[in-house]
């Protein structure tokens, strides 16, 4: 067996590992279910591991000593391991170490009132959002879904936004208005809504004043969090996470909305 016959599966495994690493944000943009647990990327890493292992097995067949002639293949094998280790560390450890929220409004508590500019720069208060006169489907208004998010360029955030937009008609039909709060300026939120086709409300909190009052701040941005408020401003459901990737799915939000009376 030639050296090339040993090296090609190892290098193929390396490139597949690279694809598995860099494709994660694109994967969960296309398939949001992979955002919470990257099963598709882990499958690619598994296939890459099989290719690398097959190449190494061929190199170390008894009596062949082909390992002396596959220096580049060994280098690729080591790089593949490093890539997987970095992926696992980033997705399963670092991304899941956001500080726990201890003072966020609890279920049954009244949410803190606030006033923030929307994507058009107009001031909007929580009281106004809860008012039937400003809530779509006013005759059946049941509340507001506050979605705290990071920033416009965040792929995980946009994955959540797309889910909300996809189910927006259902939210509105049940009398609940989704509202995103982030550190983006009104101009940035307006550009995002225009380019992505989002038709729900964005509120801007670049100073993190409201984000910190709700205890969902992480450094200089908001961590993922959702609060479902009834028309009295009382929290009826919330979702807090210590991961920058894991968020409530729209189906979970809709299930919570259905519990509102």
Describe the residue ranges of each PLM region.
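Thiol-/selenol-based redox modules, centered on thioredoxin-like
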Residues: 20, 222-261
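Short hydrophobic alpha-helix segments
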Residues: 127, 214, 237-239
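Structural microenvironment flanking redox-active thiols in thiol-disulfide oxidoreductases
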Residues: 158-196, 206-212
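Short active-site neighborhood of thiol/selenol oxidoreductases, capturing the structured segment around
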Residues: 126-164
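Membrane-embedded alpha-helical segments of integral membrane proteins
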Residues: 6-58
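Structural micro-motif
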Residues: 197-201, 216-227
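N-terminal "domain-start" segment that seeds a small globular fold
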Residues: 96-134
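Internal/C-terminal transmembrane anchor helices
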Residues: 65-93
């Amino acid at each position: 067996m030639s050296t090339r016959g040993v090296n090609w599966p190892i290098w193929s495994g390396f490139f597949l590992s690279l694809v598995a690493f860099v494709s994660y944000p694109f994967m969960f943009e296309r398939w949001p279910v992979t955002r919470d647990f990257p099963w598709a990327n882990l499958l690619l890493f598994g296939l890459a591991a099989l290719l690398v292992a097959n190449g190494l097995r061929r190199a170390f067949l008894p009596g062949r000593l082909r390992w002396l002639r596959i220096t580049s293949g060994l280098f690729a094998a080591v790089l593949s391991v490093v890539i997987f280790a970095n992926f696992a560390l980033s997705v399963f450890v670092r991304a899941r170490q956001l500080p726990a929220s201890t003072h966020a409004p609890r279920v049954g508590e009244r949410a803190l009132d606030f006033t923030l500019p929307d994507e058009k720069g107009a001031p909007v208060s929580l009281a106004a959002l809860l008012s039937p006169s400003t809530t779509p489907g006013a005759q059946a208004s049941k509340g507001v879904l506050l979605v705290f998010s990071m920033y416009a360029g965040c792929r995980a955030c946009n994955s959540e936004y797309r889910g909300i937009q996809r189910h927006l008609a259902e939210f509105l039909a049940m009398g609940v208005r989704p509202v995103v709060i982030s550190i983006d300026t009104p101009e940035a939120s307006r550009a995002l809504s225009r380019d992505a086709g989002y038709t729900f409300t964005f509120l801007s909190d670049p100073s993190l004043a409201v984000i910190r009052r709700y205890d969902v701040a992480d450094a200089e941005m908001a961590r993922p969090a959702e609060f479902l408020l009834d028309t009295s401003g009382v929290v009826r459901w919330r979702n807090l996470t210590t991961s920058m990737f894991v968020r409530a799915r729209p189906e979970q939000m809709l299930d919570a909305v259905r519990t509102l009376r």
